[in-house]
Amino acid sequence: MLELTMATVSAEDAGATAGMLMADAPSDPGTVLRVGRDRAVCRLASPDDWLFVSRVHLEFLCGPDGSWQVTWLRGSHAEPPSEVLLTLAGLPMAQPLPYGGTARLAPGGSGELVIQDRTAPRSVNVGFYHEVHAA
């Protein structure tokens, strides 16, 4: 099972956790969880007026072996108005996830993706935990 938590943070409410959203999905091949502004297709949706977040920004996909990966989907802009940083538990520093890039999530692993606005002190913070059950 993949568990996601999402919080939106701006300069006015930095450090606040009010409004945290959660979603989870079983680790079945082909299962998808999306993060973005489009509430029709995204399980976790950011504010509609936060245009630095694409309609569908991040896609978590479960592969045939039950492992998960996350992709920063390319949007309508050649250069995105945001950046995405990936932090994995046990590693000291966040790494940039390239625009259109994919990262594999370790089974049983956890971490955080931060969608950072390049023009204002706002971010969407998405925590993840891949729960693995023994067979």
Stretch-by-stretch model annotation:
Residues M1-W50, L61, D65, P96-A134:
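Intrinsically disordered, low-complexity acidic Ser/Thr-rich regulatory segments
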Residues V35, H57-L61, G66-L86:
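Short hydrophobic/aromatic patches on the structural cores and recognition surfaces of FHA
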Residues R43-S46, W72-G75, E79, L91-M93:
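Functionally constrained cores in energy, signaling, and assembly domains
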Residues F52-R55:
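Short coil-to-beta strand junction motifs in C2/discoidin
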Residues S82-Q95, Q116:
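Short strand-turn-strand beta-turns centered on an Asx-Gly dipeptide
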